[in-house]
C-alpha cells in the first residue's frame, strides 16, 4: 500500500477528529468540517457496527503516526509479545519512534516533516547521524538537529510554535542548542483520551 499523499483535511474528516497532520497552531476546525465525513454524501455520519468502529480506530491511529499497514501489524505483534497491556505497549512503541520523538521535541511541525528530517540525515542520536524514522529511541537518548539543518526556517518555526504550546513532560528540550533528551516513554495518562487503543486490540484479537 502506497503512502497517502492527498489532502490531509480529507483524512481528518474521514476519522472525525484532528489527526495532527498539519502544523501546530493551524486548527483544522476553521477549514474542515470534522463532524462530517468527506464526499458528496458525507452530511451524516452513520452508526458504526462494532467491527467498523474497531477498524476506524485502527485507521485513525495508523494515520496519526503515519504507519503503513504491514508495519502497524508488526508493531501490534511486538506489543502483544511484551508483558503488560497490549494497547499501552502499542502506544509506547509508536511514541518511541525516532520521527515521533523529533516531532514531540518540536523540531518539526508534523510527523511527516519529522520523518523527512530523519530520512535526509538532519538528525543526530547520541552524537551519531541516524536516518531510520522507525528507530526505537530509549530513555536517556539525546536527539539533536545537525548543524547543517539548524538554519532551516521550518525547524526554527516549528520550535517557536511548540515552545508557545509547551513541550510534553517526557522530553527535555534545549531550544537554543536544538537538542533534547527523551526521558522516557509517556504514561498512558499523558496521551490524549481521543485514542481508544482497546478497540485496536479487539480488532486484532479476532
From Swiss-Prot:
InterPro entries: Ribosomal_uS4, Ribosomal_uS4_bac-type, Ribosomal_uS4_CS, Ribosomal_uS4_N, S4_RNA-bd, S4_RNA-bd_sf. One of its GO terms (biological process) is translation. It comes from the Bacteria. SUPFAM superfamilies: Alpha-L RNA-binding motif. Gene3D superfamilies: Ribosomal Protein S4 Delta 41, Chain A, domain 1, RNA-binding S4 domain. Part of the 30S ribosomal subunit. Contacts protein S5. The interaction surface between S4 and S5 is involved in control of translational fidelity. One of the primary rRNA binding proteins, it binds directly to 16S rRNA where it nucleates assembly of the body of the 30S subunit. This is Small ribosomal subunit protein uS4. It comes from Methylococcus capsulatus (strain ATCC 33009 / NCIMB 11132 / Bath).
Amino acid at each position: 500500500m502506497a503512502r497517502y499523499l492527498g489532502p490531509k483535511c480529507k483524512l481528518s474528516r474521514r476519522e472525525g477528529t484532528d489527526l495532527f497532520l498539519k502544523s501546530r497552531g493551524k486548527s483544522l476546525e476553521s477549514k474542515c468540517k470534522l463532524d462530517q465525513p468527506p464526499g458528496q454524501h458525507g452530511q451524516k455520519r452513520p452508526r458504526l457496527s462494532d467491527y467498523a468502529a474497531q477498524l476506524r480506530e485502527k485507521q485513525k491511529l495508523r494515520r496519526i503516526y503515519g504507519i503503513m499497514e504491514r508495519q502497524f501489524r508488526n508493531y501490534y505483534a511486538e506489543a502483544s509479545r511484551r508483558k503488560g497491556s497490549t494497547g499501552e505497549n502499542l502506544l509506547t512503541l509508536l511514541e518511541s519512534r525516532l520521527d515521533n520523538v523529533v516531532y514531540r521535541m518540536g523540531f518539526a511541525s508534523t510527523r511527516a516533516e519529522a520523518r523527512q528530517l530523519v530520512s535526509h540525515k538532519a538528525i543526530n542520536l547520541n552524537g551519531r547521524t541516524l536516518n531510520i524514522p522507525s528507530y526505537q529511541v530509549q530513555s536517556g537518548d539525546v536527539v539533536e538537529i545537525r548543524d547543517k539543518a539548524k538554519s532551516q526556517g521550518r525547524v526554527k518555526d516549528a520550535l517557536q510554535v511548540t515552545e508557545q504550546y509547551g513541550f510534553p513532560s517526557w522530553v527535555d528540550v534545549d531550544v537554543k542548542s536544538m537538542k533534547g533528551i527523551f526521558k522516557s516513554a509517556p504514561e498512558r495518562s499523558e496521551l490524549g483520551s481521543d485514542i481508544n487503543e482497546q478497540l485496536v486490540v479487539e480488532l486484532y484479537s479476532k
